[in-house]
């Protein structure tokens, strides 16, 4: 394992490399061409290249967490006469529904339950019965449970029924291969501190340029106006409308270099998948049960049922692991008592082996 205070086994913020951290030791002027042209514009181009080889897409960077970018997309691209079908099977789909409702956006929620995979036939039925729907929005990797949702099936429906397609790929972009042009995705949303393995501070949207260009004047917010942010970056060669998180941006530029050095998204996906499979096998050997069937798992994070022991307390288990150098995540599923373990970031085979040994040592209810 690399030198650190503890290993973050979370879906982001996550454990970053020493060199990503060191990239933040430099200061940048937000008006300077070395920063805007040399760093910001390069990042925008690289993000589009990671998303698709096709022309006609652009990247917009936005200060804040991933949820800021999700709200910016919903509030900026759906017009007053628009209506969005939001597919929800976890906290992050539910958050999109809440955002739409607070902004007064017409919304058709489809909640299929936290441990159920969205059903394409049910989505098609909704589209047939509600022709007012103009947009479809869904989460790709739902970290509430660790489920990987079927964005390919929904992409086919979006194309067939001529709907604009919004995908929250917060914890999948950069860690799971995808081509947004092939999937007919109009807006893909992700964040600096997920699979690219940067640090928190900004999110980004990769958008079909023709669609984004039609969104002038639609935004329900000043600071979360995606169109205005895009035009500022386009017209001023990488300049942000408001203060740029310069140190986070420098860290992200380094993280993109390290993604390329690893072999790109496919190689990183293979590492994440190997981590997750090794984790699940080891946890089963220790007596833990995954919340989901193996066929539903993403390679990002896995939820496990809490031990059926009267003396078990998550906080005690958590602290015993932290004392050994590992940090895990509490559960977020409303109907099941569980906890979650992520395996993205600077996490390798040796780390999973060490984690499993630490978990075995932390099972105080067995002692």
Swiss-Prot record:
Gene: phnW
An example Gene Ontology biological process: organic phosphonate catabolic process
Cofactor requirements of the protein: pyridoxal 5'-phosphate
Full protein name: 2-aminoethylphosphonate--pyruvate transaminase
Residues bearing PTM N6-(pyridoxal phosphate)lysine: 194
Cysteine-cysteine disulfides: none
Originating species: Klebsiella pneumoniae subsp. pneumoniae (strain ATCC 700721 / MGH 78578)
Function in brief: Involved in phosphonate degradation.
Record has Heme as a keyword: no
């Amino acid at each position: 394992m690399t030198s650190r205070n503890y290993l973050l086994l979370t879906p982001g913020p996550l454990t970053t490399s020493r060199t990503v951290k060191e990239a933040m030791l430099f200061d940048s002027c937000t008006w300077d061409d070395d920063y805007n042209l040399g760093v910001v514009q390069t990042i925008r181009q690289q993000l589009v290249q990671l998303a698709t080889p096709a022309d006609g897409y652009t990247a917009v960077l936005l200060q804040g967490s991933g949820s800021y970018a999700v709200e910016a997309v919903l509030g900026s691209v759906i017009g007053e006469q628009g209506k969005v079908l939001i597919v929800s099977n976890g906290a992050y789909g539910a958050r999109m529904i809440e955002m739409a409702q607070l902004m007064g956006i017409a919304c058709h929620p489809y909640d299929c339950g936290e441990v159920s995979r969205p059903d394409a036939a049910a989505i098609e039925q909704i589209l047939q019965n509600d022709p007012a729907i103009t947009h479809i929005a869904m989460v790709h990797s739902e970290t509430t449970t660790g489920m990987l949702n079927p964005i390919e099936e929904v992409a086919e429906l979006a194309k067939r029924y001529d709907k604009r397609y919004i995908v929250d790929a917060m914890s999948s972009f950069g860690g799971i291969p995808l081509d947004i042009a092939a999937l007919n995705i109009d807006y893909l949303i992700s964040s600096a501190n997920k699979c690219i393995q940067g640090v928190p501070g900004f999110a980004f949207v990769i958008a079909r340029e023709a669609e984004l260009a039609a969104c002038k004047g639609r935004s329900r917010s000043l600071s979360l106006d995606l169109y205005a942010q895009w035009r500022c970056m386009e017209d001023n060669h990488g300049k942000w409308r408001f203060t740029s998180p310069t140190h986070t941006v420098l860290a992200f530029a380094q993280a993109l270099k390290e993604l390329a050095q690893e072999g790109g998204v496919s190689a990183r996906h293979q590492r994440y998948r190997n981590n997750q499979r090794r984790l699940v096998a080891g946890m089963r050997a220790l007596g833990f049960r995954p919340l989901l069937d193996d066929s539903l798992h993403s390679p990002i994070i896995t939820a496990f049922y809490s031990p059926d022991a009267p003396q078990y307390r998550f906080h005690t288990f958590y602290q015993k692991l932290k004392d050994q150098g590992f940090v895990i995540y509490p559960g977020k599923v409303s109907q099941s008592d569980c906890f979650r373990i992520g395996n993205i970031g600077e996490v390798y085979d040796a780390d999973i082996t060490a984690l499993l040994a630490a978990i075995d040592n932390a099972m105080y209810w067995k002692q």
